[in-house]
Design a protein with these regions (language model features):
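N-terminal subdomain of nucleotide-sugar transferases
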Residues: 1-65, 112, 166, 170, ...
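Short alpha-helical donor nucleotide-sugar binding micro-motif in glycosyltransferases
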Residues: 165, 278-279, 286-291
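Carbohydrate-associated surface elements
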Residues: 177, 199
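Conserved donor-binding/catalytic core segment of Leloir-type glycosyltransferases
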Residues: 209-237, 249
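Nucleotide-activated donor-binding/catalytic signature segment of Leloir-type glycosyltransferases, i.e.
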Residues: 261-282
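Acidic donor-binding loop of glycosyltransferase active sites
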Residues: 289-304, 321
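Short hydrophobic beta-strand element within catalytic cores of glycosyltransferases
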Residues: 313, 318, 322-325, 335
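Conserved acidic donor-binding segment of nucleotide-sugar-dependent glycosyltransferases
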Residues: 336-338, 342-349, 358-364, 379
Length: 411
């Protein structure tokens, strides 16, 4: 047995500012003593990074992509095949494209040389494609965490996802809704899907429901359709028309930024609404602490994309800022109407405006929601507890005891 067994995290892009849950998970594993290698299939184009990124001790490897022409790619595969006896069988029996095959071969060489005993990917897209191929090449097991777009989007090919589920040693997903969806749709292939919520390092999210709050309605997320921010702008126009004192700030960047700014201008909301662009996690936390409420008016997008369970809801509830959201996928598992938050129908700007007004004007309600929300987060979304569950799965799937001191992986 390898005296220092290692787990490989296979990610499409690392680091990625919007995927704080991956960073939190990696840091929790490291605190428990798990040795990790991080493999990134694409180079990040983010220009802002979270301060916690500097705490990651695990080595990060960029996996080389396909060569500039087919001949060079074939030559690279031939070179890898000298060290990977199963490679040509996988190439001939796979319908994967050349880039995925070459990255899988490169990854395979690395994980064998570095004593990797198991691979874990986040999102059932290219990271899982490459991990699955590498598993076939090396015989090293793989698992993945399914989130949202990777299982709901209209571009998801059912047979391809079914094969990823069936061939994996285990699948984690981030909401009970997702578990039921996958089991209903993929039957036996998804029978072993396990719910483990994305978690937070609660030491970094001190609870402060009675801080110096502004009449600020905050939205945080990528500027894409499924976040529903256009309805938050419509709700802002309704609140302004009623003379409610407030400001609305939306933090994040994305493909709809120009459209949302045009909507701000068209509704003449310049004095009430600001699109802030992307921010670091520390700056986002400060915004959450200042805000009276967090609005996440999520919707089912036209391409069937939707949120799984937005991390920003967990962060806001942990910090003591009450939330408003919609009954999309796993959100009702954390936002229980009138108990841990307020719920409105998706695409209903009037209901959203009314809910915002309630929280802007009812301090007692805000305090009650905040207290209940924090209790729920502590009970179900502590990253140290949830990462220990993940390590226990890694131990089971690899056949190697990965437990360390403290909570490290045992159940």
């Amino acid at each position: 047995m390898n005296p220092n067994p290692r787990i490989a995290y296979v990610l499409k892009v690392y680091p990625r500012t919007s995927q704080t849950f991956v960073l939190s998970e990696i840091l929790a594993h490291e605190r428990a003593g798990l040795e990790l290698d991080i493999f990134s299939l694409r180079r990040t184009d983010d220009t802002r990074f979270h301060a916690e990124l500097a705490q990651v001790q695990s080595p990060v490897f960029q996996v080389a992509r396909a060569r500039s022409n087919a001949t060079l790619t074939l030559n690279a595969l031939r070179e890898h095949a000298q060290h990977l006896p199963r490679l040509w069988d996988v190439v001939h029996n796979s319908q994967a494209n050349a880039e995925d095959l070459l990255q899988a071969a490169t990854l395979s060489r690395a994980i064998v040389e570095r004593g990797i005993i198991h691979m874990h990917a986040h999102f059932g897209t290219v990271a899982t494609v490459v991990a699955r191929l590498a598993s076939k090449i090396t015989g090293i097991s793989y698992s993945f965490t399914a989130h949202a777009k990777d299982i709901f989007h209209e571009n998801v090919v059912e047979e391809v996802l079914r094969n990823k589920l069936a061939d994996s040693s285990g699948v984690i997903t981030v909401s009970r809704f997702n578990v039921n969806y996958l089991r209903d749709k993929y039957a036996e292939a998804a029978a072993g899907v396990k719910l483990i919520y994305n978690g937070l390092d609660l030491d970094k999210f001190p609870f402060d429901p009675d801080g110096d709050k502004l009449p600020l309605v905050l939205g945080v997320g990528r500027l894409v359709e499924k976040k529903g921010f256009s309805y938050l702008l419509d709700a802002s126009a309704l609140m302004r028309a009623k003379g409610i004192p407030f400001r609305c700030e939306i933090v994040g960047g994305g493909e709809l930024e120009a459209d949302l700014q045009e909507q701000v201008n068209k509704l003449d909301l310049g004095g009430h609404v600001t699109l802030c662009g992307a921010m670091s996690q520390s700056d986002v936390k400060q915004k959450i602490r200042q805000a009276r409420l967090l609005a996440a008016p999520c919707v089912h997008a036209e391409n069937n994309d939707r949120d799984g369970l937005p991390t920003i809801l967990l962060e806001s509830m942990a910090l003591g800022t009450p939330c408003i959201s919609t009954p999309v996928t796993g959100i009702p598992e954390v936002l229980k109407p009138g108990e841990t938050g307020l719920m409105v129908a998706e695409r209903d700007a009037n209901a959203l405006a009314d809910a915002c007004e309630r929280l802007l004007t009812d301090q007692q309600l805000c305090t009650e929601l905040a207290l209940n929300g924090r209790r729920l987060i502590e009970d179900q979304f502590d990253i140290n507890k949830n990462a220990a569950e993940i390590r226990a799965l890694f131990s089971s799937m690899s056949g190697v005891d990965l437990s360390r001191g403290g909570d490290g992986g045992g159940t």
